[in-house]
Design a protein with these regions (language model features):
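Conserved, mostly hydrophobic/aromatic
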Residues: 19, 55, 95
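Alpha-helix-loop-beta-strand connector modules within alpha/beta enzyme cores
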Residues: 80-102
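Glycine-rich, proline-tolerant flexible connector loops at the mouths of alpha/beta enzymes
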Residues: 36-43, 56, 62-84, 151
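Alpha/beta enzyme core
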Residues: 126-148
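N-terminal small/glycine-rich loop or linker at the start of catalytic domains
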Residues: 6-42, 68-75, 104-132
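Conserved small/polar residues in nucleotide/adenosyl-binding loops
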Residues: 149-155
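A structural motif corresponding to the C-terminal end of an alpha-helix
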Residues: 58-59, 94-109, 142-148
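Aromatic/hydrophobic pocket-lining residues that form the small-molecule binding cavity
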Residues: 48, 88-92, 132-136
Length: 155
């Protein structure tokens, strides 16, 4: 089946993107409250893949990579900044795998990246804002790599 892009799908009706990874992964026992860093993509990738499939089964048209809070600031706080890129790349690859893996005759899901808020952005003190921009730019860069430089790129 030919895969339609987002605009084509929206022209035909609503497009659903399931959300709620953070609290559902915590509820399932794969994340502790506190900093809420998505280490599950490295520590238990099968659990993250299963959650994506559950959302897909529930009707989500878009598989959203669980990279929320997977940025340099949060990784620094938990002392795992060196795992930043592997965490993001793993989460993106898992989402892409699930998005493209559908039953025969079923249109593949779209895939999306995800960034979160930052606790260091301050519109009154711009000294940290370049760091925030860089932090999110690198996440977007890894998502672009995942989409463009691997086979069967999702939209």
């Amino acid at each position: 089946m030919t895969k339609k892009n987002l605009k084509e799908r929206l022209d035909k009706g609503p497009v659903i993107c399931a959300e709620g990874f953070l609290f559902e992964i915590e509820r399932r026992g794969y994340m502790s409250s506190g900093e809420f860093v998505p280490m599950v993509s490295l520590d238990h990738p099968e659990a993250l893949e299963n959650l994506h499939r559950d959302f897909q089964h529930a009707g989500s048209d878009i598989v959203q990579a669980f990279t929320y809070n997977g940025h340099r600031e949060k990784m620094r706080v938990i002392g795992k900044e060196e795992l930043l890129e592997p965490l993001n790349r793993s989460a993106l690859q898992i989402a892409k795998k699930v998005a493209l893996d559908t039953s025969e005759g079923i249109e593949p899901n779209l895939m999306a990246g995800n960034i979160s808020n930052s606790n260091i952005w301050n519109d009154k003190d711009t000294s940290q804002n370049k760091e925030v921009e860089k932090m999110f730019s690198e996440m977007v860069g890894w998502a672009v790599d995942c989409l463009l430089y691997t086979s069967d790129a999702a939209d």
